[in-house]
Regions:
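Detector for small/aliphatic-rich hydrophobic stretches
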Residues: 5-6, 17-161, 399
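Non-catalytic interaction/Regulatory regions outside core domains
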Residues: 4, 87, 331-334, 340-358, ...
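Short alpha-helical patches at coil-to-helix transitions and adjacent helical residues
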Residues: 3, 69-73, 192-196, 390
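Short Gly/aromatic-enriched secondary-structure transition segments
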Residues: 91-95, 212-219, 276-284
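Extended hydrophobic
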Residues: 198, 250-266, 370-402
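Sec-dependent bacterial lipoprotein signal peptides
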Residues: 1-15
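Non-catalytic, conformational "gating/processing" segments within enzyme and secreted inhibitor domains
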Residues: 62, 102-269, 287, 291-369
Length: 402
């Protein structure tokens, strides 16, 4: 499958429905509840706004897209700590967070990183890791190093980038460990001129609260945006699920484990363009799902991708850090961003979803009488994974071909 992948926040949605005919996970643990104050919840909502804009910016007609908006948001948040006023304003405006101070953004990211580390659902594994590497002998300002340690739990390491293969091996080793071996080679173009690599890694592995029965997985046709028909494996189930139906699309909510996380699948009605519904979904925030008995047919799929983000971020308004060598003087003098890159992985099957991403910034210098609906996901669709208590988007994307 030919793909485009991006990553920064995680998209999963939850419903509390359960089917007694399906075996449940034993001892699911206490449901994660990230308690945000009013301001932090507002920042979270702005982060989801950024996620939607990012998907629209990358939604090429005939290519699959995978995003982790949270991963990119955290990486840019780290970079913002070293930006001068003009560069900082570009970063936070692009993130839809211009109304908040650096201290408020750092506090919000610290809260998320700490809460995610405390997740105790045995059916869900979730991790956010940060790290930084600077050229040996390069002087990094103390305030920046302190903020990275305090708010982002990010060690600042020294690395000999002139020994390119050894430098790549160290950073790839970190990525492999942080993503449970789902991303092993970042393919970063390091050389002796590299001064900085700032990195975030996110990893999610969630088991459906009701797994799909493999006996019901059947071969079917997925109708791609490119006009081609793809033969693929479809998972099939009929069960009570949270569901939204409009004149333009159908949306279903699938939960993981103890419902701390959920996934949404949004399917445009036949004849409706996938890009058109992205804006409609954004306008429909706060929509109320109802419980239906859903006859669901959902394709198994996997995405592996690498995306260079420079032009996308520049088109969204971040320019100074790429062109002004005084823009990051809060980190060090003379530093420029040469590359923003995301590597990603996503796999969905009968048991659940495994997803991971790395964002790197390289620098030089329920109802018993539920109505029945059918949702056959055999044409392009949008998906997302959310943390339930905040609604924060971890991963999101679109599938237009198999």
């Amino acid at each position: 499958m030919k793909n485009l992948f991006l990553l920064l926040c995680l998209l999963l949605l939850a419903s509390s429905c359960s089917n007694n005919d399906t075996p449940s996970i034993d001892n699911p643990g206490e449901k994660l509840n990230i308690e945000l104050d009013f301001q932090q919840r507002s920042i979270c909502e702005k982060g989801n706004d950024f996620a939607g804009k990012l998907l629209l910016q990358t939604a090429e007609e005939n290519e699959n897209v995978l995003l982790s908006p949270l991963s990119l948001q955290v990486a840019l948040g780290m970079l913002a700590n070293g930006a001068n006023e003009e560069a900082y304003n570009e970063i936070v405006t692009t993130l839809s967070m211009a109304d908040y101070s650096l201290a408020e953004l750092n506090g919000y990211h610290q809260k998320l990183i700490t809460a995610i580390a405390d997740e105790n659902d045995p059916s869900v594994e979730l991790a956010l890791d940060n790290s930084m590497w600077f050229k040996e002998g390069f002087s990094v300002k103390n305030t920046f190093k302190e903020n990275m340690s305090t708010y982002y739990n990010a060690p600042v390491n020294s690395l000999d980038f002139s020994n390119t293969e050894k430098a790549k091996a160290e950073i790839n080793g970190w990525a492999k460990e942080a993503t449970q071996s789902t991303i092993k080679d970042l393919q970063l173009p390091l050389d002796a001129s590299t001064t900085m690599v700032l990195a975030n890694a996110s990893y999610f592995n969630g088991k459906w609260d009701e797994p799909f029965d493999k006996k019901n997985t059947k071969e079917g046709i997925f109708y791609g945006n490119d006009g081609k028909n793809y033969t693929t494996q479809f998972m099939n189930a009929k069960r009570p699920l949270a569901y939204v139906g409009t004149d333009s699309y159908q949306k279903v909510y699938l939960t993981f484990g103890n419902s701390s996380f959920y996934m949404t699948i949004t399917l445009p009605k036949e004849g409706v363009n996938l890009r058109d519904i992205l804006s409609e979904i954004e306008r429909a925030k706060g929509e109320q799902a109802q419980i239906f008995s859903v006859k669901l047919s959902l394709p198994k799929f996997q995405i592996n991708s690498l995306s260079k983000m420079n032009k996308i971020l520049q088109d969204m308004g971040i320019n100074k850090v790429f062109e002004d060598d005084e823009s990051l003087n809060g980190i060090a003098n003379g530093l420029l961003v040469s590359l923003v890159q995301q590597n990603s992985y996503f796999n969905m099957d009968e048991n659940g979803v495994e997803a991971s991403s790395t964002s790197t910034i390289t620098g030089i210098t329920g109802s018993n009488a539920a109505p029945i609906v059918e949702m056959k996901v055999n044409r392009p669709f949008v998906f997302a994974i959310h943390e339930n208590s905040t609604g924060a988007i971890l991963f999101m994307g679109k599938v237009v071909r198999m």
